Design a protein with these regions (language model features):
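A ligand-binding cleft/hinge motif common to bilobed small-molecule-binding domains
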Residues: 93-96, 109-118, 162-166, 189-224
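Extracytoplasmic small-molecule ligand-binding "clamshell" domains
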Residues: 38-110, 117, 178-179
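Periplasmic-binding protein-like
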Residues: 50-52, 126-134, 202, 206-240
Length: 240
């Protein structure tokens, strides 16, 4: 990604963050485990379950959490008098961790669409498209070319639901839907030709495509557009 593109992306990211913070998170924390009106020199901590992938949440060279979701969460909870603590979780365990109160919320480029009744949501704060990435040397250009192919997705995501046809779309029937825990694992699989295509959030995949120096390309079609939100345990934030 060139310097101009990076600057433009950062500017857009900050504008989006401020708009989202001002319009969504006013008063959302009533009912959390730690009361925000406690008088203490230390801010009460809210634990955020997250998954690491750029540009939403990742570690910089100093080991600090940075990214779109990190900036949004930090600013939102700062205004509400909380100190966010980011906890990288196993994505497959997110619901159990939330239920057990090991985390207070899930903030990780998490899709609200189709899960509206499953959690107490704050959002949407951004929108995302599900996209498909293939190797540049593969003859796959449109959805129909995916018929009978092997697909890599991240476990328990919308991409998995789409290719297992739990969600209606124009995608054809494929021969395999291989579920991985991390984006890096999916790209390792396609690099070794274990799978023919990868499906997932556009921004997440775009970073790997851009860093791939021409090894990968993204199909033009999108099978699904989704709203992103912050998930709390149902019944804990009735004022939303």
């Amino acid at each position: 990604m060139g310097n101009r593109a990076v600057r433009k992306w950062k500017k857009t990211r900050m504008v989006t963050a401020m708009l989202a913070v001002c319009s969504i998170f006013f008063g959302i924390i009533v009912g959390c485990k730690v009361k925000s009106n406690e008088k203490s020199e230390m801010l009460p901590i809210i634990t955020i379950g997250t998954d690491q992938f750029e540009p939403y949440n990742y570690l910089d060279s100093k080991g600090n959490n940075v990214g779109v979701d990190v900036e949004l969460a930090t600013e939102a909870f700062k205004r509400l008098g909380y100190e966010p603590r980011f906890c990288v979780i196993s994505w497959e365990d997110k619901e159990q961790l939330l239920s057990d109160e090991a985390i207070d919320c899930i903030w990780a480029c998490y899709t609200m669409t189709g899960r509206e009744d499953k959690y107490q949501w704050a959002g949407p704060y951004l929108y995302s498209r599900q996209m498909i990435v293939v190797r540049s040397d593969h003859d796959i250009w449109k959805f129909d070319d995916l018929e009978g192919k092997r697909i890599a997705v991240q476990a328990t995501t919308k991409a998995e639901d789409l290719f297992l046809h739990r969600i209606e779309s124009d995608l054809p029937t494929v021969s395999q839907v291989n579920c991985f825990s991390a984006t890096e694992d999916m790209f390792a699989a396609i690099r070794k030709n274990y799978v023919d295509a990868i499906a997932g959030h556009e921004a997440m995949l775009r970073k790997f495509v851009d860093d791939g120096e021409g090894a990968y390309r993204m199909l033009e079609e999108s099978p699904y557009r989704s709203a992103l939100g912050v998930a709390f345990r149902k019944g804990t934030h009735a004022e939303l």
